[in-house]
Amino acid sequence: MNKFEKSLRFIREKISSDSPFYGKIFLVGGCVRDELLGERYSDLDLLIDMPDGQKKFVEWMCASFPEHCKGPFYYQRYGTTAMDIIIDQTTTLVECVEPHIETYADDGVSLLETRFCTLEEDAQRRDYTCNALYKNLSTGQIIDPTGRGIDDLKHGLLRTPAEPNQIYRQDPVRMLRGIRFKHQKGFRLDDAAWQAILQQHDEMRLSSPKRLRDELNKMLKARTFGEGINDLYISGLLAYVIPGLSDYLGDADQHPRCEPGVSLWQHTRTALSVLCHEHPHTEPLMKLTVLVLDIADIHGEDAAKQILANAQIGKERTISILHLVQMYKRFRSFYRNREYVGRPRALSHFIVALGQKKDDFRRMVRALNHQLRYENQLPFQVFYDEDFVPKERHQHDRRTGRRSKAEGSSAPSRSTSPSPTPEQLEQIKKERNHRRNLKRREQRKRKRQADRNRGADTAD
């Protein structure tokens, strides 16, 4: 039970049958949707079905249970009243509203006023039918005022309760949220909703950068993040979410290291799809690294840095991503035509420098290998064994080179030895373990002999 579920249980226990709020409090929006999908709550929004109910309820909770409820906090512009519920030393923000209708100016964006209404009218102003569901906290009954919300949820359909252009004009971020739901929840957008997004995408310029950043951070957790970025690019929303990125995705030129006909965005999109499909819980940091790596490789790190700055992901994450980009370039410099050309022990030192990021880096390298020409693919298998053979081979090459020079002949080229196969790597690992065991056995034998000699000297 997470903090939202604990807070909801606390509220439910405090609303007795003789309370004026009994039967008037509804769980609303994404909370009901996630519950029906069998997922945990990620926020807590309540609707109080009475005029000024949000103020009355929060004020009553804070006055009646001051040790657990802190507030109230008023947000006059949106007609919202909130409170902090503290349970087990964990604080949860609970936002409360009344069912209301919003009146906008002629531009469809400027909010003029809000007024109390019925649940049916309140449902018509919400973004999608699957989010226009209400659960009565007292009875547990789920109400579907649009008559389509539960059915659309079962079929994974994102449809607006009212005319899509009107819904998106009131809050343009709803367009971005629809694409996020599509790739985060596995839903599909209604055709009318998608056409409205194509028509209304310029309205996104009116949205605050903070809300756009929050939606991007949520989309980074999607299993089909690469396809989500592609949908944002096609719809025109990407220009507002990550300004500048569209300029590079629209470049149809051949990627210099890829197979014929593969552009920069085709390679990046494929790598993201492979990474998210094979490892659904990949860290957002690695996804962002793959997103800008080809751009940094072809157009320079300054271009990638500018895109990350436009995405407002934070200075620390930007530094980490650029560091991973540099590490990838360094790893690639160890190989030429799939042959190791680095200095002795350089690869071992590189793997140690990766630290806990080694597995994530290996997965990224493997994903980026897709659609690269064979000679440009990098051996991600080396990250399975830190005592990789190039170190030993180069030590042998150096000894051979010195011997060859003494005999008046030139040293063999480093690039003449092929990269080892996975079977050879496994054999090398077994031989290494065998040598280590022999060494330890010999050390124990010498220690026992020393102990016996010490005991004999004491007896004398």
Residue ranges of predicted features:
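Catalytic cores of the polymerase beta-like nucleotidyltransferase superfamily
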Residues: 1-460
